């Protein structure tokens, strides 16, 4: 039972419980008056038989005959004898009341356990956030110079996620360390001994960066004169590089890796250009999709988001900057705590809207907006209220909103995404339009799997085939 169902059932059950209690109280009052009167007349021995069981015409069914005890006229007026059919109706209602009370008790227990679990989760999130703030404060209070360790075999600083048998929110928020974290623990073991288990270095992160940074050091002397002369090179110098990066981005997995390495090698020369920075952020997003290691995925998403932020600092009028910043927010949110995931969701929507406002003919922006609306429309009532309480902003979207965005992306570029067509089919099915859903399902089957999202949504497509089968 979902939390929303638990809340609704609890409210309905509470009303039923109050009505039942009032009825039982009235019956108890009548029973008490009858008992007192029989005591006065010296007929207390007949009271246990005032309500008795008797066999009905239905085999196997017993009903309780509500017959009046012989007495004065007042007794007969208080509890008149009921016909057998009336007694059966009363018993059926009492059975229904008892069943409802049992169901209500079960729902209350489930609601209590779910609320207890939610409270514990929120407390854990707050505690982890406070502990992380304390760690950052301690590190800022005791700055020191890092000593490089020969065991790492690299001069670059890599951010990795903590590894272990369990992966908690505390680790996802603050379990970062560098490849040389061992030397940090040796210098500050007394102050940060409790963080030692969380800071496990990852020795297999982004091996390609080592060579790229070595090349940067070799090219530093040649690029310094250009930087001192006036910053970045002109457009005629960087344009071939940008075109090559765009071509590699549209290629296969190997092409994306080469494009990332190409941009990383030229960051020292062209890193002050906005059109270079958002392409570098896009390359980080590609690498985040390609890698399978969780720590590497988080590191790529984090570094890419920083590059996108640097690009936005140079101007707010680039649709590509907003678009790839939103994409990296979504990728990084997969490795963050609940509160930060909610914040990333709002940032995602904000920057996608800006990208659409600046470049309304971009099909990717409309596809991302449709996916956001679809996910929000399927949040539970409790999840929406939690998000609204955390950020003091309403969170609402419908399946119809998602459908319009997906259709807009398909209109701008037919066959833009296989996943987009699957989402269109799912939206039509949820809106009760099965014929349209079948049509878009067939169109989705015509497209090849291009992205990992296309592969991941293949299961949904197979389920649609079964549901929409003629």
UniProtKB/Swiss-Prot annotation:
Comp. bias regions, Low complexity? 220-231
Write down a Pfam family by its short name: RMD1-3
The GO cellular component terms are: cytoplasm; glutamatergic synapse; intercellular bridge; mitochondrial outer membrane; mitochondrion; mitotic spindle pole; nucleus; organelle membrane contact site
Q: Where in the cell is it found?
A: Mitochondrion outer membrane; Cytoplasm; Nucleus; Cytoplasm, Cytoskeleton, Spindle
What residue ranges are annotated as transmembrane? 13-35
Acidic residues bias (residue ranges): 191-201
For this chain, the Swiss-Prot or TrEMBL PTM comment says:
Phosphorylation at Thr-160 of the FFAT motif activates interaction with MOSPD2, VAPA and VAPB.
Expression tissues? Present at high level in epidermis and seminiferous epithelium: while basal cells in the epidermis and spermatogonia show no perceptible amount, keratinocytes of suprabasal layers and differentiating first-order spermatocytes up to spermatids exhibit high expression. In skeletal muscle, its presence is restricted to fibers of the fast twitch type. In surface epithelia containing ciliated cells, it is associated with the microtubular structures responsible for ciliary movement.
GO molecular function list = microtubule binding
**Topological domains (Mitochondrial intermembrane): residue ranges?**
1-12
| Motif, FFAT: chain positions | 157-163
Disordered, as annotated region: 168-231
Any notes on this protein's domains? The transmembrane region is required for mitochondrial localization. The FFAT motif is required for interaction with MOSPD2. The FFAT motif is involved in the interaction with VAPA and VAPB and its phosphorylation regulates these interactions.
Subunit record text: Interacts with PTPN2. Interacts with microtubules. Interacts with VAPB. Interacts (via FFAT motif) with MOSPD2 (via MSP domain). Interacts (via phosphorylated FFAT motif) with MOSPD2, VAPA and VAPB.
Identify this protein by name. Regulator of microtubule dynamics protein 3
UniProt organism field:
Homo sapiens
């Amino acid at each position: 039972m979902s939390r929303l169902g638990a809340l609704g059932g609890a409210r309905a059950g509470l009303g039923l419980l109050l009505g039942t209690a009032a009825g039982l109280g009235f019956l108890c009052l009548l029973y008490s008056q009858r008992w007192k009167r029989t005591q006065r007349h010296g007929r207390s021995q007949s009271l246990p038989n005032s309500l008795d069981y008797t066999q009905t015409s239905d085999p196997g069914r017993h009903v309780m005959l509500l017959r009046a005890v012989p007495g004065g006229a007042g007794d007969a007026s208080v509890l008149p004898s009921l016909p057998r059919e009336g007694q059966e109706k009363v018993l059926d209602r009492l059975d229904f009341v008892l069943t409802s009370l049992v169901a209500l008790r079960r729902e209350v227990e489930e609601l209590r356990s779910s609320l207890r679990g939610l409270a514990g989760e929120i407390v854990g999130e707050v505690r982890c956030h406070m502990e992380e703030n304390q760690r950052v404060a301690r590190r800022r209070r005791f700055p020191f110079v890092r000593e490089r360790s020969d065991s790492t075999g690299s001069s670059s600083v890599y951010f990795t996620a903590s590894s272990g048998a369990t992966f908690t929110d505390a680790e996802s928020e603050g379990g970062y360390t560098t490849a040389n974290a061992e030397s940090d623990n040796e210098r500050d073991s007394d102050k940060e001994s409790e963080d030692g288990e969380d800071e496990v270095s990852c020795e297999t992160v982004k091996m390609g960066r080592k060579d790229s940074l070595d090349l940067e050091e070799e090219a530093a002397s040649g690029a310094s004169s250009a930087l001192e002369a006036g910053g970045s090179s002109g457009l005629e110098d960087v344009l071939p590089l940008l075109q090559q990066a765009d071509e590699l981005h549209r290629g296969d997995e190997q092409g994306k890796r080469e494009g990332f390495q190409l941009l990383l090698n030229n960051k020292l020369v062209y890193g002050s250009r906005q059109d270079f920075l958002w392409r570098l952020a896009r390359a980080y997003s590609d690498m985040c999709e390609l890698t399978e290691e969780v720590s590497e995925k988080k590191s790529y998403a984090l570094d890419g988001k920083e590059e996108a932020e640097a690009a936005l600092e140079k101007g707010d009028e680039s649709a590509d900057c907003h678009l790839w910043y939103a994409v990296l927010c979504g990728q990084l949110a997969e490795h963050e705590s609940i509160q930060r995931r909610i914040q990333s969701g709002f940032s995602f929507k904000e920057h996608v809207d800006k990208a659409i406002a600046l470049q309304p003919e971009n099909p990717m922006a409309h596809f991302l907006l449709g996916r956001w609306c679809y996910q929000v429309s399927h949040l539970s009532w409790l999840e929406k209220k939690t998000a609204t309480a955390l950020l003091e902003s309403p969170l609402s979207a419908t399946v119809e909103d998602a459908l319009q965005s997906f259709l807009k992306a398909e209109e701008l570029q037919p066959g833009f995404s296989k996943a987009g067509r699957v989402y269109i089919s799912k939206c039509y099915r949820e809106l009760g339009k099965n014929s349209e859903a079948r049509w878009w399902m067939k169109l989705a089957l015509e497209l090849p799997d291009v992205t990992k999202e296309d592969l991941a949504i293949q299961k949904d497509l197979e389920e649609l085939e079964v549901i929409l089968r003629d």
